[in-house]
Amino acid sequence: MAKFKAFLKRKDVEVSLKRYGIDALGAMAQGLFCTLLVGTILDTLGTQLGIGFLASPIVEINDVGYTIGKFASAMVGPAMAVAIGYALHAPAMVLFSLIPVGYATNVMGGAGGPLAVYVVTVVAAECGKIVSKETKIDILVTPIVTVLIGIGLAYFIASPIGKGAMAVGDVIKWATTQQPFVMGVLVSVIVGIALTLPISSAAICAALSLTGLAGGAALAGCCANMVGFAVISFRENGWGGVVSQGLGTSMLQMGNIVRNPRIWIPAIAASAITGPVATCVFKLEMNGAAVSSGMGTCGLVGPIGVWTGWANPSAEALLDGAQAIIPSAADWLGLALISIVLPAILAWLFGRLCRKLGWIKDGDLKLN
């Protein structure tokens, strides 16, 4: 046993909460941010501001047009895998071999793609590190072992992880059948949590065709998490944190959440309030694309989805009886309050309370 421990130490294989639960998760969120979320932001800028080189496809592959943003988004699996490998101190050959592992796993994982990539990449990277430079044909052995173990493991567990993520969708589907106040609380809290976890809230909302009042509640929960974390972590992260979390993803805080789960209280508490306010007070409906219900303020996709749904309801919304409307001042006020103003104020208040109680300490929300 002593020799085995010494071998693992020599290979820098450290089985610890910090290495796997904080470093790897935090790095994975950065990989997701640099691809899927930056791609989403670029597409949104191109479409809404009429920036030709961002809005127009730059090439067609198999009759599918790809914009710059779409290319960036397509690389989310490889980017997450490489980021995780980097956090695990994987040597170069292992790191490069994780690119196909991440791509395959994310595709097979569906709504649970990010979580599947995390689990599979950790195993593949550590196995690759163990065999790295142990043979005279390392240039063959290391990538073959990493790719075979990674994609082989993904074949068996990525799809079940995706189905497990969709089980969250079953809970959301049940919540949508409740009366508006209860539905607002449940959908907002659950979808907001899903947004921050390493699963795809957008994919879940799309699969459930979540539009109407339920879509509005989902939007409220996502915005509460993104804006909430951006505001309460301003002390530690400044304006860079506001942009990366408020327009990017609250998943960047996953490593810190593992370290101190209580930092999630302000955002969740805010979502429990903004959800029913959206459904009962403002009757806020997401009648744009269902996927927008799970995007929050990422590239402002969520609020823009509500706006486009007013004038041109999506096919999913039309099936639920949605109609085009001319938004009133109350509609615009509700959208602004639910998406940005209320989450910011409520999370700040709950954040101050948590800091006074000693539940959140300086540095707990610091992003690397």
Enumerate the predicted regions with their spans.
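Pore-lining transmembrane helices
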Residues: 1-368
